[in-house]
């Protein structure tokens, strides 16, 4: 019989009774009809700006995700990462874990460019495509990816990049 672990033996098998069952829960104290609704990129931009630390906008790159239900009502905003002056780490598994845990049907992601350059980098385009495809497997729609600077923004959806 093939084992998953080449060092596995019968004496180090787990005691199944000691394992815990995984349980999901999600609590939101705001009624769905009272949550903000995102209709266009400008709505998402306003919400992202309201939670972004403006003092860091030109200092370090950060990545955030807006979580929405099927009616585009906001479930929450997740701060994915903060990096350096020229990049940040985006972990798709963690983003999708957060989206699934919050029962999001749609997501919009955003990151800032401290340089003020609104042009997406090849890495920006690649991570957007990978996130879009991974989310699709979970029946989650990536609606947009915004690049934000202190004075402006670019929407991948408005530019036909999603």
Model-based region annotation:
Residues 2-28, 46, 71, 81, ...:
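Active-site-proximal loop/helix of nucleotide/amide-processing enzymes and allied scaffolds
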Residues 34-94, 98:
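Glycine-rich, small/polar surface segments that engage phosphate groups of diverse ligands
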């Amino acid at each position: 019989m093939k084992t998953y672990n080449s060092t596995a033996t019968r004496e180090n098998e787990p005691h199944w009774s000691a394992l815990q069952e995984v349980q999901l829960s999600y609590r939101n104290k705001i009624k769905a009809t009272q949550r903000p609704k995102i209709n266009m990129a400008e709505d998402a931009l306003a919400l992202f700006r309201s939670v972004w630390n403006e003092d860091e906008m030109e200092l370090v790159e950060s990545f955030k995700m807006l979580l929405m239900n099927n009616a585009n009502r906001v479930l929450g905003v997740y701060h994915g990462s903060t990096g350096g002056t020229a990049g940040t780490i985006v972990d798709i598994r963690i983003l999708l874990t957060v989206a699934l845990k919050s029962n999001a049907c749609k997501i919009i992601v955003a990151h800032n460019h401290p340089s003020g350059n609104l042009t997406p980098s090849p890495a920006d385009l690649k991570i957007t495509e990978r996130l879009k495809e991974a989310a699709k497997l979970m029946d989650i729609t990536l609606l947009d990816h915004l690049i934000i600077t202190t004075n402006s923004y670019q929407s991948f959806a408005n530019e036909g990049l999603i």
